[in-house]
């Protein structure tokens, strides 16, 4: 007999959210009391656009570095298959407003301060698809996202 499961992100009505936003998906408590917090980092409006894979890939590599420079406890920040944002998984209880600030400042650095030499994991030894990167695209997406403002609410625009 198969266990019935609900996948939260498939229950979310993607037609009513207003990207870009940061949304707390869940706080899970492990068997020893450890808390893991999962965020929806939605940068592009679902079903209206999607990031090209090269730009998304470069943003992914940069966020892996930039988030860790700004906040402790990052477990992973991985792109959605739909290419509209990322899952961000953290140790402990985390504040959505703080996460929004971290993402905003990371995107600001991508848009204005990053050079190709700053992008980690771009060699054949360090990346499984090292030829599929575009810093130009990453910068353009970061600028577009920042121009729209990052909201702390998925359903009502409350840009930080």
Swiss-Prot record:
Biological process terms in GO annotation: quorum sensing
Q: Which cofactor does it need?
A: Fe cation
Cofactor binding notes: Binds 1 Fe cation per subunit.
Q: Identify a single GO molecular function assigned to this protein.
A: iron ion binding
Family listed: Belongs to the LuxS family.
Q: What is this protein called?
A: S-ribosylhomocysteine lyase
Q: What does this protein do?
A: Involved in the synthesis of autoinducer 2 (AI-2) which is secreted by bacteria and is used to communicate both the cell density and the metabolic potential of the environment. The regulation of gene expression in response to changes in cell density is called quorum sensing. Catalyzes the transformation of S-ribosylhomocysteine (RHC) to homocysteine (HC) and 4,5-dihydroxy-2,3-pentadione (DPD).
InterPro entries (alphabetical):
LuxS_sf, Metalloenz_LuxS/M16, S-ribosylhomocysteinase
Domain of life, per lineage: Bacteria
- The encoding gene is luxS
- Keywords assigned: Autoinducer synthesis, Iron, Lyase, Metal-binding, Quorum sensing
